[in-house]
Regions:
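N-terminal cap/lid subdomain of alpha/beta-hydrolase-fold enzymes
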Residues: 28-126, 417
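A catalytic-pocket lid/entrance helix-loop region that shapes and gates access to the active site
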Residues: 74-78, 175-273
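Alpha/beta-hydrolase active-site loop
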Residues: 100-103, 110, 127-146
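Alpha/beta-hydrolase fold nucleophile elbow
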Residues: 149-162
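Glycine-rich nucleophile elbow surrounding the catalytic serine of serine-hydrolase chemistry
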Residues: 159-172
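Alpha/beta-hydrolase fold catalytic core
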Residues: 251-406
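Active-site-adjacent alpha-helix of alpha/beta-hydrolase-fold enzymes
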Residues: 405-428
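Catalytic histidine-centered segment of alpha/beta-hydrolase-like enzymes
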Residues: 435-446
Length: 459
């Protein structure tokens, strides 16, 4: 279908292609039908002059709808400027902050998400795992580039959340398997090393990784003591970083060997940076867990805070509950408005006809197969480093939300500072920060800033 959108005051004419690309075995037997939506700017005859970006979300089990209708595509879900949903009926508007003026885009729904399905549902589990997912999405990218004659185009990947795990490994996979060298990888709310965010006995790392985001959250809700509360967000986060990588990390490592005086000192400092009480920090042995923190910070106000975006709050319905019962930043209305809009958009504007339900976020992919990393944490950082070393021109842009308690900023910074990227290549990594959460682009201020940052990065 043919369309037009105005971006930065310029009319952009484009072609939208929505459909399935069939993955096959070498003998031609069908393996899966992968659904995608592609946008190609009209008037460009030489593909070498026009970038091509492949986009996907995470989960595992998520379709590509969030990046598609939230930030990148030529149409976006209309929301309040603060990122909250409007009442139904939900609707789309032209996205004047779309990236279509910078790059053609292909939104991929991995097998079992969106309208993508395995050829034989009994074999769908063959696609539901870390390695299987990289292989199938990689095969889609290779096939699309070949079928649509885009091998000479500058090529990029953009993933969000688990999609950053996929994108990091995929960059290495595309190079090693197909000789496809990318120009860039964009990681939105990154998780490359799962040890940084899995709260488990014997793993003290996440407590330090989450502390700066705890501090940002407490600052936002005015739960910090003075004079810290009067300082800027960036200054508060930096003080929390310094404490987390110094005294706090040392205290966590010493464990039960800490003296009573040191415990009291660290308790006071953790309290001062998190907004929690002395007694609560003491009860946690200096280790507040994310799901408890969300329930505890504003308990006296009767509020639970969001994990995906800690600016959001909701009522605590079980006052004695130790853990958050639900995430107010992942409210059903957000999923509902995106689900409504993608179904309406595909059928009415892109003329897609199917009897299949569009799986926005499905549990059908679980249990996800991590058998490649039994008895260890999944860590794709070495694969991204390998891609960068093999391809010294590969650039990486990491977008972070200050209020993201799902993939906290310091965990990402820690991961990149422990990747052993050669000094000559470190300039290829760009970090940007936004005053919002996991899907930072839902906040209009961040949506606008992301587009400005994208214009600089794609230059």
């Amino acid at each position: 279908t043919q369309h037009a959108v105005t971006i930065d005051g310029k009319r952009i004419e484009y072609e939208a292609t929505a459909g399935h690309l069939t993955l096959t075995k070498e003998d031609g037997a069908e393996r899966a039908r992968v659904f995608f939506v592609a946008y190609t700017r009209k008037g460009t005859s030489d593909p070498a002059t026009r970038p091509l970006t492949f986009s996907f979300n995470g989960g595992p089990g998520s379709s590509s709808v969030w990046l598609h209708l939230g930030v990148l595509g030529p149409r976006r879900v209309l929301m309040n400027d603060d990122g909250t949903t409007l009442p139904p009926p939900y609707r789309l508007v032209d996205n004047e902050y779309s990236w279509l003026d910078l790059t053609d885009m292909v939104f991929i729904d991995p097998v079992s998400t969106g309208y993508s399905r395995a050829a034989d549902e009994k074999n769908a589990k063959d696609f539901h795992g870390y390695r299987q997912d990289i292989e199938s999405v990689g095969e889609f990218v290779r096939r699309y580039v070949s079928d649509y004659r885009r091998w000479s185009s500058p090529k990029y990947l953009i993933g969000e959340s688990y999609g950053t795990t996929r994108a990091s490994a995929l960059a290495d996979h595309l190079q090693s398997q197909f000789g496809m060298y990318l120009n860039g990888v964009i990681l939105v709310s990154a998780v490359l090393n799962f040890q940084t965010l899995v709260f488990a006995e014997g793993n003290d790392l996440p407590y330090a990784m989450f502390l700066p985001t705890y501090a940002a959250t407490a600052w936002y809700h005015k739960a910090l003591p003075e004079p810290l509360q009067s300082q800027s967000l960036a200054d508060v986060v930096q003080q929390a970083r310094t404490f987390a990588e110094g005294e706090y990390a040392t205290a966590l490592m010493k464990g039960d060997a800490l003296s009573a005086a040191t415990i009291a000192d660290i308790t006071t400092k953790v309290k001062g940076l998190t907004g929690l009480s002395d007694s609560y920090v003491t009860a946690t042995r200096l280790r507040p867990v994310i799901y408890r923190y969300c329930q505890e910070l504003l308990r006296t106000r009767g509020l639970v805070i969001g994990r995906f975006d800690s600016r959001y709050t909701g009522p605590i319905t079980e006052p004695l509950s130790e853990y958050m019962e639900r995430d107010p930043s992942h409210h059903p209305t957000i999923a509902g408005c995106f689900s409504t809009c993608i179904n309406d958009y595909l059928s009415r504007e892109l003329d897609v006809r199917t009897t299949l339900p569009y799986e926005v976020l499905t549990g059908r992919v679980h249990p996800w197969d991590y058998s490649n990393v039994q008895n260890e944490y999944l860590n794709v950082a070495p694969r991204l480093r390998n891609a960068m070393v093999t391809n010294p021109d590969l650039r990486v842009w990491v977008a972070n939300g200050y209020y993201d308690l799902a993939t906290p900023i310091y965990g990402t910074e820690y991961t990149f500072s422990h990747m052993a990227i050669p000094p000559s290549l470190r300039k290829n990594v760009t970090m940007t920060y936004y005053p919002a959460g996991h899907m930072m682009y839902l906040l209009k201020e961040s949506l606008i800033q992301m587009k400005a940052d994208a214009k600089q990065w794609f230059k």
